[in-house]
Amino acid sequence: MAETIQIGPIVLRFLHSRHDTNGSLDMFEMDVAEDGRMPVPHYHRNWDETIYGLRGTLMFDVGGKPITLNPEDTFFIPRGTVHGFENRSGKLATCLCVLTPGVLGAEYFRELSAVVAAGKPDPKVLREIMLRHGLVPVAA
């Protein structure tokens, strides 16, 4: 059964994780509400990410290059590449995210969700959570 995790305006539905793929991949659908965005651009130390558009439109910045993700579009983010996204379309947007190898799991997102749900999160706490899970935040 898929696990659903909400982090503010972003909802993740985990379809597979490192736990059920023997570490091969993590896979989740990500809904981004209108005006939703990744609060901190970052890069991954230990995994690559492939994004596939399902519905709506998201704007990504990948390595300083703007990318518009529409339904059926796809792109690849190599580990070490700074990226971020936002939904400027005025409508819900959804994409499929595949992380390879599967080293993150849902644990990071669960922890982040709890901190965000408790109120305005301390940026130092968010940074510590990100670093502990292999994401390196980069100043915007």
Can you say where each PLM-predicted feature lies in the sequence?
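Double-stranded beta-helix
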Residues: 91-140
